[in-house]
Amino acid sequence: MQIFPAIDLKNGQCVRLFQGDFSKKTVVNEDPIAQAKAFATDGATYLHIVDLDGALEGRPINLEIIQRMKKAAKIPVQVGGGIRSMAQVDYYLESGIDRVIIGSAALTDPDFLRAAVQKYGAKIVAGIDAKNGFVATRGWLDVSQVSYLDLAKRMEKVGVETIIYTDISRDGTLTGPNLEQMANLKEHVKVSLIASGGVSSRADLEALAQLGLYGAIAGKALYNHDISMSDIVEVEQIAY
């Protein structure tokens, strides 16, 4: 299973949120470039970067910093946050970013998602963020009436190969991932699934790996030292 250390960017710093609440923000490193390099040095093979400023503004804000992070880390990066037009997708991918995550627009503008997948294939990842099973958009500020499973099925139909699923109620809480929802997704869609939200321990990563998922994202637990990079490297190499 591929495990992605997460770096969330706000005002040029690495931060963690609690349940996606921008008022409950903790700065975990003032230097995101050093953080990216440290993760890579300790064995990370792929980084998950979210431009929180971009998610709020609806346009990429931190591309220059992200480019410098990738250059320092020398490993692939996937980036999300405010990517809502083909021009923005082009902007990221032409600048050397490996994959882009389309979140809100996957629900609000399915034609854009379809066009992006047709143009870039596996470089497009769909992000589904849900609260109590219903999809949230616009930096998690708005909650729709669309269920996470219905949206995942729509994503599969338009050709999306990889979906990141975030349970907002668990994000940044260290209460464990939503194994039930991940298992439900695994049963009903045949895309590569990445779990996000709530990972608190090596045991959580092992439980996700046992579901047969493609990947998992580790954030707060890494910064709190509840999970080490050596844990991540070891779990990635276990065959379930």
From Swiss-Prot:
Protein location: Cytoplasm
Family matches, as CDD domains: HisA (cd04732)
GO terms for MF: 1-(5-phosphoribosyl)-5-[(5-phosphoribosylamino)methylideneamino]imidazole-4-carboxamide isomerase activity
GO-annotated cellular components: cytoplasm
Organism expressing this protein natively: Listeria monocytogenes serotype 4b (strain CLIP80459)
Organism lineage string: Bacteria, Bacillati, Bacillota, Bacilli, Bacillales
Domain of life: Bacteria
Gene3D superfamilies named among the record's database cross-references: Aldolase class I
GO terms under biological process: L-histidine biosynthetic process; L-tryptophan biosynthetic process
UniProt family annotation: Belongs to the HisA/HisF family.
Record flagged with keyword Mitochondrion: no
One Pfam entry name: His_biosynth
Reactions the enzyme catalyzes: 1-(5-phospho-beta-D-ribosyl)-5-[(5-phospho-beta-D-ribosylamino)methylideneamino]imidazole-4-carboxamide = 5-[(5-phospho-1-deoxy-D-ribulos-1-ylimino)methylamino]-1-(5-phospho-beta-D-ribosyl)imidazole-4-carboxamide
Catalytic residues identified in the record: 8 (proton acceptor), 129 (proton donor)
Keywords: Amino-acid biosynthesis, Cytoplasm, Histidine biosynthesis, Isomerase
UniProt protein name: 1-(5-phosphoribosyl)-5-[(5-phosphoribosylamino)methylideneamino] imidazole-4-carboxamide isomerase
Main location: cytoplasm
Pathway entry: Amino-acid biosynthesis; L-histidine biosynthesis; L-histidine from 5-phospho-alpha-D-ribose 1-diphosphate: step 4/9
Disulfide bonds: none
EC number: 5.3.1.16
